[in-house]
């Protein structure tokens, strides 16, 4: 594994570790979840950009160093729609990996366009 790949994998592991500690109160709005995720990343000293445009009409909730994109969904998202959305994001060159943060588990592929996909709920 080359150094760049190892660094991306390390960054992904660090971000996942920070996000797995989130415990969202019931009845949060989606932007409240955005705030919880951003606070968790800040506590772990992981910078992120919010509402990042990747392409025309294609904006992801957060992007962390190394091109790790985070999409946040409240409730039980529709699997077909979320996979289509993640597929659009994974097709963008600036994204190296994706993390889906949801309140409930959604079955998503492990990889899309060769990029790792993780789900945190």
Indicate residue ranges for each PLM-predicted region.
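Hydrophobic beta-strand residues in large extracellular and virion-surface proteins
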Residues: 37, 48, 70, 99-100
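Acidic-basic catalytic patches of nuclease active cores, encompassing PD-(D/E)XK
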Residues: 2-53
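Conserved catalytic cores of phosphodiester-cleaving nucleases, focusing on short active-site segments
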Residues: 62-76, 89
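Catalytic centers of nucleases
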Residues: 53-65
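Surface-exposed alpha-helical segments enriched in charged/polar residues
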Residues: 17, 39, 84-91
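Amphipathic coiled-coil/heptad-repeat helices and related helical stalk/stem segments
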Residues: 55-56, 82-85
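Short glycine/proline-enriched coil/turn segments at helix->beta-strand junctions
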Residues: 42-46, 64-68, 92-96, 114-115
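Nucleic-acid nuclease catalytic cores
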Residues: 76-81, 90-121
